[in-house]
Amino acid sequence: MAEILERSGYLVKVRVEVPADRVKASYEALLKDLASRVRVPGFRPGKAPLKVVEARLGREALLQDLKERLVEETYPEAVRELGLSPVAARVVEQDLSEGEGFRYVAEVENYPEVRLPDWRSFALEVSPPEVTEEMVEKALEELRQRYAELVPVEREAQEKDHLFVRTEEGAEFPIDLAKALPHVREALLGKKAGDVVMVPVLNDKGEKVREVRTEVLEVKTLKLPELDEEFAKTLEAESLEDLKNRVRESLKRQAERAYEEARERAFLEKLAEGLEVEIPPSMLRAEERHLLEHLAEDLYRQGISLEAYLEALKEKGELEKFQEDLRKEAEKRVRIALAREKLAEELNPEVSEEEWQAYLQAAARAYGVAVQDLRRQFGEEGLARLKERLRQDKAVQEALKALG
C-alpha cells in the first residue's frame, strides 16, 4: 500500500507499506539467490542449507540487503499507483521488524507542474530580413577571395602574403601571415625571397625558449579574379548580372532563415522566462552534467582535458563565474525544454505519417546513415523521443504562425 504523506511543489513525501507475507517471500528468494552464489565450506556450490547460509552471511547484513531489495521491487509500483512521475528520490525512513511488514518513507522529486504565460500576447522584437546592395557587393568580394590564386612576387612580404620557408632542420612549409602567430608574423614581415631570419619559439607562458633559423624561399600574394562576365561564367552564371541576382536571392534565403530562427529563439526564450514552474534540483544538476560532458568532448578534440581546463580557470580566478554561468545556462535549457513540452501538450499538433517519414529521412541524412540503420540505432524509445521532438517543433511553428 502506498500513500502521499505530504506534497510541497515538486517534493512529495510517500509512505509505502509491504505486507509481512511479501517480506517473508522476498527474504526466502534473497537467501536462495545468495545460496546459489556463496561458497560454504563442506558444501557443494548451491547445496548449503539456507540456515547455514544465513548464519554465514549474518542476519543484519541480510536484512539490509532485504530492505534494498524490497525498495527496488515496490518503489516503482508505488509511484505508478500514486500517479507520480519521479525524476529523483531517496529513502528517508525505514522500519523492518521480525515477523512484521516493511515500511519506508521516500522523498520524491516529482516532474514539475508547468504553467505557460499568455504567449498569444507576445510581441517579438525581431528585425525583418533585409538584403542591401552593400551585402551583395560584400558577398561578391568574398567569392573573388574564394577563387583567388596565389602568385609569386619579387618584393618584401606584406600583411596578407603567403611565405614558403625552410628551417635549419630542412623542413619546408607555407605560412599564411594573416593567420600566423604574432611573433612569427613580426619576424617575417618585410622579408623577401632569399632572406634568412631567426624566428623565436615561445613556451606556454609566452617566453622565448629558443630561435629557429628560417630561410624565406618564396613570397606569394593573392591575385583576385576580375569581377566580370568571364568570372561569372566560371561560376555557371549566364552573365555578371545573372551572378549578382543569384547572389542576391541566396542572401535573401539566408536572411529569411536567420529571421525565422531568430523569431523562434526569441519566442522560446520569452516563453521560458514567463514559465511558472518550480524546477527540481536533480533536473538542473543533470543538465549541468550534460553541458559539462559536451564541453569535455569539445576540449578533448583540442587535446585538453576538462580537469586541466577547470584548473586553469581556478588559477585565473574565473572558476566561480564559470560555475555560475553553467548553472544559468542549465536552468535556461531546462525551462525551454519544459516550455516546449507544455506548449505541445496545449496545442496538441498531429504528426502525419508523411511528416514523420520526411523527418526520419532528414535525421538520417544528418547522421550520415540509412533510415533503417537510424531506426535500429535509436530503438523504440529513441524514435519515440524523436517523434515527440517533431511534435514540439510543430507546436512552436503553430504558435509563431498564430502570432503573425
Swiss-Prot record:
Q: Name one Pfam family in it.
A: Trigger_N
Q: Which InterPro entries match?
A: PPIase_dom_sf, Trig_fac, Trigger_fac_C, Trigger_fac_C_sf, Trigger_fac_ribosome-bd_bac, Trigger_fac_ribosome-bd_sf, Trigger_fact/SurA_dom_sf
GO molecular function list: peptidyl-prolyl cis-trans isomerase activity; protein folding chaperone; ribosome binding
Is S-adenosyl-L-methionine a UniProt keyword of this protein? no
One GO biological process this protein is involved in is:
chaperone-mediated protein folding
Q: Where in the cell is it found?
A: Cytoplasm
Organism's domain of life? Answer: Bacteria
Determine if Chaperone is one of this entry's keywords: yes
User: Which cysteines in this chain are paired by disulphide bridges?
Assistant: none
Q: Which GO terms describe its cellular component?
A: cytoplasm
Q: What is known of its domains?
A: Consists of 3 domains; the N-terminus binds the ribosome, the middle domain has PPIase activity, while the C-terminus has intrinsic chaperone activity on its own.
UniProt family annotation: Belongs to the FKBP-type PPIase family. Tig subfamily.
Protein name in UniProt: Trigger factor
Source organism per entry reads: Thermus thermophilus (strain ATCC 27634 / DSM 579 / HB8)
